[in-house]
């Protein structure tokens, strides 16, 4: 066990909890919108890096480099798809979602927005969405907790299960205490750490490999490593990852939290730039790992192994905290999104219609703990699958279920309440069925799921009575809203 690296991790944990305590101290009198959406008062830098950090989980430091390290640059189609999807979501989707959520009775969650968009008192859409949120986010959070366990096991030789418990406790602590503001500010610092680590480590490794440093193996890249055009399935599936952004609640909720259109425009430039650099450097990490390390037993540890071999303990501890940053910044956002879905979309509408703001906050906090416990059970199960697999499954469900209907709700006036319910149900169902029965096709399930959700929403809307004039007026007001 390296006690210097351990000391860095402990200092990092203390800093994260301190942020949670700070915002908890400021939360007296805070309402539902403050805890779950930061009072719609977030600035450009914090929102941009929070959206990016909550998106780019430990997958970007472990999963993506591992895939490219093993299979070559053909796996970068995932990064290309994500980069395109992220840019499109910021440029075209973010301004409208912010306006529409305000016009739709100042909605603070995605299920709430989708219901209020149609001025409906029918809560079936809200409840269906919340159920999908709770299930998928529990699986997603498990991947982040599992990544923390892998890091501690590799670096500190601590039992992975014990490490997962420690990480889960810290994540729950500052999310439970500080809510959305604490999550966004911790994500901001975590995003800076991730950027620094991915800029420093692979460039140092490449320089050392080129210089023939004694630590380097002088390994050559495998034949065909730079073959981008592998199979049509790889390209379609990789680009299909970009569809997930249009339905990823814990990311797009940041669009709704910005305090003005001016801040949103600045945030989009910062966010797209940050993500582009992160994805490029993640791919470069795999190349650097091949050239500097040669063959290693566990490809998911290429970043960890490279950093520990190059840098002294204090520096490696700081750089490896990037993996903690990536995992924790995603997990905290997932826990908060799931808790807000329960508190705002199930607890108040169904269980306690007259619940006060204080009661709503505590309902959300309790759900943070419950989901974290279940996610911890999944993560600690040796049969739960890889980090990449867990992320892939949850990402697919969200993108297929919510992506089509959120896009249509922002750009198509003819969309109906029934069409939205049908789109969510069809997208989720086809995604899951494809995963279970047709995964052998090697087509990522989000692609057919997204297509099914889009088709169902359009067909059912066209076959049903159109939205009333009041719903159409809301659409027009939202388009013209300036704030």
Predicted feature locations:
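Membrane-embedded helix-loop-helix hairpins and adjacent transmembrane boundary segments
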Residues: 1-483
